[in-house]
Amino acid sequence: MTKIAFTGGGTVGHVSVNLSLIPTAIEEGYDTFYIGSKNGIEREMIESQLPSIKYHSISSGKLRRYISWDNIKDIFKVLKGVLDARSVLKKEKPDLLFSKGGFVSVPVVIAAKSLKIPTIIHESDLTPGLANKISLKFAKKIYTTFEDTLNYLPKDKADFVGATVREDLKTGDKHRGYQLTEFNNDKKVLLVMGGSLGSKKLNDIIRQNLETLQETYQVIHLTGKGLLDNSYVGTKDYIQFEFVKDDLTDLLAITDTVISRAGSNAIYEFLALRIPMLLIPLGLDQSRGDQIDNAKHFESKGFGKTILEDTLTENELKTQLREIETNRDDIIKQMQTYKESFTRQDLFQKIINDALSE
């Protein structure tokens, strides 16, 4: 039986494609296992959503683009991670490795190369991340979500495959969504998502402008962990959650407009659902700028609007939401021109063919 190793972690985006592909691998009769960090979000997601999958943890060090003494310490963590990963791979003997990126993936890809295990890596963002730039030297192929990403990569190794969204994404139940929120279908619904960690600045501006927003919308506010404000409990046309997992598809089913960070996986899900979006990407003080690139690219395609976090004000928020509502039909029409390049099954078969071909 062909066996496939999966790796990737550090953020939700570095796990979600794996969560989509692993069930396909199992359905097709392949044996699978996962390699990730000991305490990363990937472990929590894999063990909670795919509890039957064997999970192996390895040492991992963060990859930084700036000078820091921590880089010296983390070199040794990465080296230990390579040894840990080699041990796992020698024991499991996979036929191929699929890597979604993130700092934990680098030692796994290096270890796989040392054992002559073919590796396919996947890049979700418009510009390649540091982990995938390093891993590319040891991989057979890299797949991209954005077609323009091919401009940053060697032609003989890079293939555009488009976004891979969850199979259950379009199965949300509107009735259940209205039940969860106690909203009704007489008024538009605005979903606000500040990412898993939340955004205090975005949360504050939403709450400060709640009365104005409620003139147009019923508001679902995903605040991030520890950022609920109990003084708003019971407020008409407003409901807040720290984080939603199992019921998110039901909430998306009733959403007319979304305010969100600009992680690639999330914004492609909004695109697949034809939900106009106002994107507020992580700034350069919190990231390498990948979300800014993603957001500007989506805005250039006519899928929504963008506000940079350092220019996020009450007035700018109102202006951009007004623009979205004025041009809603045109935005949705533009979204309808987007076609998914590969089904989940097609992408999985491509991985197998590319990895195992001579």
Swiss-Prot record:
It is an enzyme of class 2 (transferase). UDP-N-acetyl-alpha-D-glucosamine binds at residues 166, 196, 291. InterPro entries: GlcNAc_MurG (IPR006009), Glyco_trans_28_C (IPR007235), GlycoTrans_28_N (IPR004276). The keyword Signal does not apply. GO terms for molecular function: undecaprenyldiphospho-muramoylpentapeptide beta-N-acetylglucosaminyltransferase activity. SUPFAM superfamilies: UDP-Glycosyltransferase/glycogen phosphorylase. Keywords: Cell cycle, Cell division, Cell membrane, Cell shape, Cell wall biogenesis/degradation, Glycosyltransferase, Membrane, Peptidoglycan synthesis, Transferase. The keyword Glycosyltransferase applies. It catalyses: Mur2Ac(oyl-L-Ala-gamma-D-Glu-L-Lys-D-Ala-D-Ala)-di-trans,octa-cis-undecaprenyl diphosphate + UDP-N-acetyl-alpha-D-glucosamine = beta-D-GlcNAc-(1->4)-Mur2Ac(oyl-L-Ala-gamma-D-Glu-L-Lys-D-Ala-D-Ala)-di-trans,octa-cis-undecaprenyl diphosphate + UDP + H(+). Belongs to the glycosyltransferase 28 family. MurG subfamily. This is UDP-N-acetylglucosamine--N-acetylmuramyl-(pentapeptide) pyrophosphoryl-undecaprenol N-acetylglucosamine transferase. The gene is murG.
